[in-house]
Regions:
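Surface-exposed strand-loop-strand hairpins of Gram-negative outer-membrane beta-barrel proteins
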Residues: 3-20
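Outer-membrane beta-barrel porins/channels
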Residues: 25, 32-474
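Outer-membrane beta-barrel pore proteins
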Residues: 1-6, 33-36
Length: 474
């Protein structure tokens, strides 16, 4: 059983986000039975927190004329979904004399189909600041600076059911069924200083759901007289079934805006399949006082499979309704362009100066999942974009983790204390820098292209974790 504290080393407290959070991380047990003179069969259950989302992100920088509402306006100027934008018109599903009609982004000037790249922020912008109240004309407004804060909370809980065994203390086999439980929440506020006004966006988001995966592995001692061992394992994708819900608001002091305030909420059910993971490990024990280990893992994040729930059927045998899904091919192609394979290296050592005391050291390196210039693409014709309520993103870099720990044994009772420090840098962008959403202003000889770029803002995710583990051997 393990628990402790997670402390964020940088950032400013915001909303319900805290820099120090208590965390219950693990509880489990193993039942072992002898199947031969030197062979055993083990049955285990383990709960552990696979991901802790508690984090506060703060960023502020100059914008030099670019703005989030300019991104929406530029997409509208492109005029059609095929060009990466949309055609803005009053809601065509309602009577023309209905004064409650909102502005919608359509796939073409004559279509009644909503463009899939007309996201929730585009909707809010065109029904407030991007539309002039007096004339109904559309405009974009420049900004000089931004301020951004987001508080993340929640976790992914892993419930692992394991069967393992060994053959003559030479070959060790194991298989694990993992059940995942997703609880993610975030709340963000984003403000821009316009030329003569201010604008703010608030977004509350929640993702819940579940998933499962399977892991199988083998460890072999090739030389009977040696403690040296070689291991290999493979982990299937985690097959997630998720629901994203949001409530997003906009407010501006721009006097020409169609409305000073707007709000939208949506729910999106989808499936998300993570990459396969492959690993190899080496280990060796020197006497009864020193243990050394090294592990290498590889996951290709460019193979992430985002899927659209597109129907379903009733399974009469199991008496339940089953959803069907298909790949979101446009989003998955974009994933291949911006993400890459991730390598993880784990090194560890344990030294016992006396029989019941252990000193442990560890180091982890995780390479970045993002290509150097990888970013969101708000022009994609994808349901993932249509339901998006966040324009910002962080291109996170490599992770370095350092661990030190002490373990003490009193008869059958074990006490372990550990400290881990994790450091990661990243580039924050309030919206995407994409030439495809640059637009032309003016006519004839005065025409010019006006890009909507934001400079990277350096951010960090540095955290310390203090962990206490208690164990008992029956």
């Amino acid at each position: 059983m393990s628990g402790g504290l997670v402390v964020q080393g940088n950032g400013t407290a915001f909303s319900n986000g805290k820099k120090t959070n208590a965390s219950f991380d693990q509880i489990g047990g193993v039942y072992s039975m002898r199947t031969g003179r030197t062979s055993y069969l083990n049955f285990g259950f383990n709960y552990h927190k696979g991901r802790n989302f508690d984090y506060i992100l703060n960023a502020a920088n100059a914008l030099n004329g670019s703005s989030l509402n300019n991104q929406s306006y530029a997409k509208g100027e492109l005029g059609s979904e095929g060009k990466g934008g949309y055609y803005v018109d009053l809601d065509r599903s309602k009577p023309q004399n209905d004064k409650r009609r909102d502005f919608i982004g359509y796939s073409t000037p004559t279509s009644t189909d909503n463009a899939l790249n007309f996201d929730q922020l585009d909707y809010l912008n065109f029904n407030t600041i991007n539309t002039e109240k007096a004339t109904g004309n559309h405009y974009g407004y420049n900004a000089s600076a931004f301020d951004f804060n987001r508080a993340y909370t929640g976790y992914i809980g892993n419930y692992d059911f394991n069967v393992s065994g060994n053959l003559n203390n030479r070959v060790y086999l194991g298989i694990t069924l993992g059940i995942k439980d997703v609880h993610y929440k975030s709340y963000s506020e984003y403000f821009e200083q316009l030329d003569n006004a201010q604008i703010g966006y608030a977004n509350e988001k929640e993702i819940t759901g579940n998933g499962f995966d399977i892991t199988a592995g083998i460890i072999v001692r090739p030389v009977e007289s040696s403690a040296f061992r070689i291991g290999a394992y493979v982990k299937s994708p985690t097959w997630y079934d998720l629901r994203a819900e949001n409530n997003t608001q906009i407010e501006t002091t721009e006097a020409r805006a169609l409305n000073p305030f707007g709000e939208i909420g949506n729910t999106y059910d989808y499936k998300f399949f993570t990459p396969w993971k492959f690993g190899i490990s080496l280990g060796h024990t020197v006497g009864n006082y020193l243990a050394l280990g090294a592990t290498y893992e590889y996951e290709d994040y460019s193979t992430i499979n985002s899927r659209i729930n597109d129907g379903g059927y009733y399974d009469w045998y199991y008496d339940e309704y089953r959803e069907t899904s298909s790949p979101d091919r446009i989003m998955n192609n974009h994933t291949k362009q911006v993400l890459r394979g991730v390598s993880t290296l784990k090194l560890g050592a344990e030294y016992k100066p006396v029989e019941n005391l252990a000193i442990r050291l560890g180091y982890n390196y995780v390479s970045s999942a993002y290509k150097e210039n990888g970013q969101k693409d708000p022009t994609l014709s994808s349901l993932g974009n249509a339901y998006s309520s966040e324009a910002d993103f962080v291109n996170w870099k490599d992770i370095n983790r350092f661990t030190v720990g002490l373990g003490y044994q009193i008869k059958k009772f074990n006490i372990d204390l550990a400290y881990q420090y994790s450091a990661q840098k990243g580039d924050f962008y309030p919206f995407s820098n994409l030439p495809a959403i640059s637009y032309t202003t003016g006519t004839g000889a005065t025409a010019k292209t006006t890009p909507n770029f934001a400079s990277a803002t350096k951010v960090e995710n540095n955290r310390s974790q203090f962990l206490l583990t208690l164990g008992y051997q029956f």
